[in-house]
Amino acid sequence: MDQEVEKIIEHIEKGENFLLSGGAGSGKTYSLVQVIREVIARHPSSKIACMTYTNASVHEIERRVDHPNLNVSTIHDFLWDNIKNFQREIKVTLIEMLNTDDSGISLNGYDGEVPSDFFDKDRESDFAIQYKEYIKLQDGIISHDEVLKLSERMFFKYPKIVSFVKSRYPFVFIDEYQDTNPLIVKILLEYFLKVTKKCVVGFFGDSMQAIYDDGVGDIDSYLITDDNPDGCVYEVQKKQNRRCPQAVITLANSLRLDSLRQEPSTDVKAPNMTEDGHVKEGSISFYYSDEDKTDTLKEKLTNEFGWDFSDTENTKELRLTHNLIANEAGFETLMQIHDSDKIIEYGKRLRDYAKTKGVLDDIKPLILEESIKVLSSKFPDDKKKWSPTKAQLNFIEANSDLYAEALNMPFESIACYVDKDQLLDDKSEEDAGKGTGSKLSPLNHHLHKIEHCIQLYLDNDFNEFMRSTSIKQITRASQKKELREGIDRIVSSYNDMTISEVIDLADSLEICVKDDKVNSYIENNPYLWKRIKEVSYKEARNVYDYRMGNKPFSTQHKTKGLEYNNVLVILKSNWSNYDFASLFYDNGKKYSIVERTKKLFYVCCTRAKENLVVYYPSASDAIINGAKMLFGESNIYTI
């Protein structure tokens, strides 16, 4: 048993909550499995709940530990499993939330206050709220986001539910805690403490790998320290690194923002050890240039060092900016719609101008054409300030039919907020976009679910396919034939079918029904829907493949938990949330930006099992000097 596991068991036997902090490649999941096995051995009649971030992680832990008293599930499944039998309380709480403006839950198409008997009146006596892959509140069906918000409200409001869960599970463990929604942490470390029943809560993860804005990031405020003796969680650090070579470990340690400093594994069988029992040295290199020479660098790595960028299991190219990848990955049109549609840009230009003039509320209820007439009438001398820019005008003239339709659409649907995160947000791609907090639009989330279900069917994973679809059961041979023919049609004709056609077919076959969120999105975004629905479904498939990592390139967000022999990191971005120059010198950026950037860079660097190359196009002298400090002067190269 690892010494870190021994310390954790000591805390468990004392009834103390704990956190296992382990850096990249430390074997945190292995420690989690060891802890579970030891708890089972010591408390064979007690049930253990283990929450993980994705279904893939659920299956991995279940494969390693097979015991009837172990319940491994995603966070959402755990929450629903524990509140689903409190139907009266669910209905009461849902009604309260539907009638509260800031609850994050609303009833599509319903005006006024929702009556207290909404989920009981004119329904069967045994009518129950259900949790599914889609939301239809009118029918009492909630989805992932609603389960999280509903659960938090119910655990706060009903101590008896807390008591029920603590009695049911004396041990609750959370894997990858840093990505967990803060509401979950509040339930486990605040609401749980208000009920005296014994229950040990354990967290496993790494705050340096907290790269999603909606995750808790860390639980430092709950840790028991000299400065915080009233905390409720004991920290145990796991310092060994079993993945990375020494050169990468040294670099990664210089990036960490906490007290944890990793060291090579002492296990001679660890992947980063040589045959004679020494840690691999590996290599780190920093390349820079006066202009973008990415292709030149990739040719050099291929020809001189034998890198094979088509071998996605061993070699990975990481970029931050999706735009650099869209053309190569085959979703250029969808990217253009979400990131640089000129009619939407014109709508935003009108909105911003109207706001400065105090007339935004006057034009919000109008169609686009009428809103332009209002501005033209009120501010004729300011026409240059609200007229289309040259680029916007060129697009409008080249797409006159599209613009003519847009003129008759609601102004707010044109001047809407849309960005590439709504197409490509990297949150929870393993779990088909299931994670709460994903920035995917409801429409793109729906497209991802369709392709996910198709892939399950093609992989002959019929149990997971049935669980993921809206199909209740297949009882007739004709039904099975219709389903197979429908999926075969999509797979064989995706080049010729539009996104709209595939959505309708998947809905009719109940592979993926159009729920409240999708219908609301289509209704409230007629211009975006007009543009997206006519795009080839092939682009949606390419987006899915890209988000799932089935391409030779990725954004840096996508690789947490993965590892490759060769890693190329390209530090090129125009995102305001990150500033790569701040990695190399103090340029006065806000700490939140510096912290976010360092964590993302840390995740990228620690993917490398052998060789790490970092490339910075158009690097300044200050960046180059900072790189020499981080990488060592002998590891700096120009192209």
Which residues make up each language-model segment?
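The feature marks helicase ATPase cores and/or their adjacent C-terminal helical subdomains
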Residues: 1-639
